Amino acid sequence: MPFGCVTLGDKKNYNQPSEVTDRYDLGQVIKTEEFCEIFRAKDKTTGKLHTCKKFQKRDGRKVRKAAKNEIGILKMVKHPNILQLVDVFVTRKEYFIFLELATGREVFDWILDQGYYSERDTSNVVRQVLEAVAYLHSLKIVHRNLKLENLVYYNRLKNSKIVISDFHLAKLENGLIKEPCGTPEYLAPEVVGRQRYGRPVDCWAIGVIMYILLSGNPPFYEEVEEDDYENHDKNLFRKILAGDYEFDSPYWDDISQAAKDLVTRLMEVEQDQRITAEEAISHEWISGNAASDKNIKDGVCAQIEKNFARAKWKKAVRVTTLMKRLRAPEQSGTAATQSASDAATPGAAGGAIAAAAAAAAAGGAASASGASATAATEGGAGCAAKSDDIASADRSATPATDGSATPATDGSVTPATDGSITPATDGSVTPATDRSATPATDGRATPATEESTVPATQSSALPAAKAAATPEPAVAQPDSTALEGATGQAPPSSKGEEATGCAQESQRVETS
C-alpha cells in the first residue's frame, strides 16, 4: 500500500498514533480551517517539510466525510498544479493527511508585492488553473470550491508555479450533482438556482477569478449600507442568476477585448453553452499573444485593497438569507405540506403519531405500529446526540432537519442532509453529511461513518407508509440550534418545543 493509511472502510486495522509521531515531527498548529487543524510536519527520515492536516473524528460526520473525500480524490490525481498527497494515517480518533508544502504566497499577496503587473501575468495564472481543472475534468472530478484563496504559489521563486489546494468538496461526477456547495460569490447560476450541475461550475468560478485578477473587483458586488447583509445577499443571487455583471469604466478601460471575451464565455449563464476548461486553454488570450503587456498594477491593487483588504464581500453570507435563496425553487412546493405537518405534530410524540395514523389510513396497521415504535425508541437517543453536538466545539457537526440553518463559528453556510444550509468556517458551502451506506457482508446497510454519535437504523426497518406520510419539512422555522448559533445563547423553549425537537431529530436519525 503506497501510503500509511488503511482502507477507509476498514473498521479494524487502524494506525496507532505512535506510527505518526515515529515518522513525523509535528510542530505547532499554524492554521485552523473549517474541518481541520494544519501543522507543518518534518519527515524524520528525509528531513523534508510537509503540510499536515489533522481531522478529529469526534467533530462530527461532516468532518469525517470531508477527510475521506479529500483522501479519496487526492489519491486519484497527480498534476504539477495540484498539491500532491504524500502520506495518510487513520487512527481511531483522527485522520492525518500529509501534503506537499507550498511555501509561496496567495495570488493577492503576490500581486500587491509586484512592481509591474499586466494581463500577461494574469494569463499565466489562469492558464495554470485551467490546465489543472482540465485534468480534473478528464477524470470526471468537479472541484466545486475554486476561489482565489485556494490558489497559492508553490514557492517564492520568481517563476513559481500555481497550485490548487483544498479538495474536501471535490466530487466525482457520476451523473449530475444537486447539493449546493462552494463559496457564495463564486457560485454558478445553476447552483444558486438549485439545478443539477457538473463540471461547468468550475469554469464559471475561473471566470470570476479572472474578472477579479484583471479589475480588482468581484463581478457581482455593489456598495450597501454597513451590515445590510440581507440586501447584499438578495442582490448577489439575483445578479448571479441573471449573469448581471459589466466591464465597468475605468477599471476595464485598459483591458483587451480578448480578455473580456474569455471572461464572457467562462461566465455564460447557460451551463451547456459555457466554454470548457480544455477549450479555454486554446483561447487566444491564453495560448496566443492577445494578452496585453500594459502595466495595470496601480488600478488593480487600489481596488483589491478597497474590496478585499476590508473583506466586505468575502464576509460570511448570512445563514437564513442564503438558505432561502438557495431553496427558493423548492419553497412554494413544500409550504403547504409543511403547514399540515406542523399541525399534525403538536407534542413530543407528534411525529410518531402522525406517521402511525397515516400508515394506518393507508391500510398498513402493522407498519404504523412499527413507525410509532421506531420514533418512540429513537427519540431520546436523537435528542441526546443533538445535545452532545451542541456542546461540541463544532456547532455545525449536526445539521438541522427542518430546513433551518445551523450556524457555525463565523456564520457562513453549508448544506445539511436535506439540502438546508448549515454554517462552515471559511465562507464556503459544504454538504453536511454522507447519506450513503456501506453494504455489509450479509446484505444489510450500515452507516458510512461508524464513529457517528447519532445511532443509525437499517433502511429495511423503516415502514414505507411512514416515509410517505412524513413530508420533508423544507422551510420550517429555525430551530433552537440555529438560534443558539446566531446569538451565542440557547433561546428559551417550552417543554412542548423540546419534545417536538426530539421527534424531529428522531426523523433525521431514521433517514440517516
UniProtKB/Swiss-Prot annotation:
Disordered as annotated region, ranges: 328-347, 393-512
Composition-biased stretches (Polar residues): 398-439, 449-460
Domain Protein kinase: 24-286
Cofactor(s) annotated in UniProt: Ca(2+)
Compositionally biased region (Low complexity): 332-347, 461-478
Gene3D superfamilies membership: Phosphorylase Kinase, domain 1, Transferase(Phosphotransferase) domain 1
GO biological process, one term: regulation of modification of postsynaptic structure
GO cellular component labels: cytoplasmic vesicle membrane; glutamatergic synapse; plasma membrane
Subcellular location: Cell membrane; Cytoplasmic vesicle membrane
Positions carrying Phosphothreonine: T446, T470
Keyword set, alphabetical order: Calmodulin-binding, Cell membrane, Cytoplasmic vesicle, Membrane, Phosphoprotein
Superkingdom, taxonomy of origin: Eukaryota
Primary location class: membrane
Membrane topology of this protein: Peripheral membrane protein
One Gene Ontology molecular-function label: protein kinase activity
Residue numbers bearing the Phosphoserine modification: S392
Alphabetical list of Pfam families matching this protein: Pkinase
Subunit composition and interactions: Interacts with calmodulin, in the presence of calcium.
Comment text on domains: The protein kinase domain is predicted to be catalytically inactive.
Function in brief: Does not appear to have detectable kinase activity.
Stated family: Belongs to the protein kinase superfamily. CAMK Ser/Thr protein kinase family.
Protein name, UniProt field: CaM kinase-like vesicle-associated protein
Organism, as annotated: Mus musculus (Mouse)
Primary gene name: Camkv
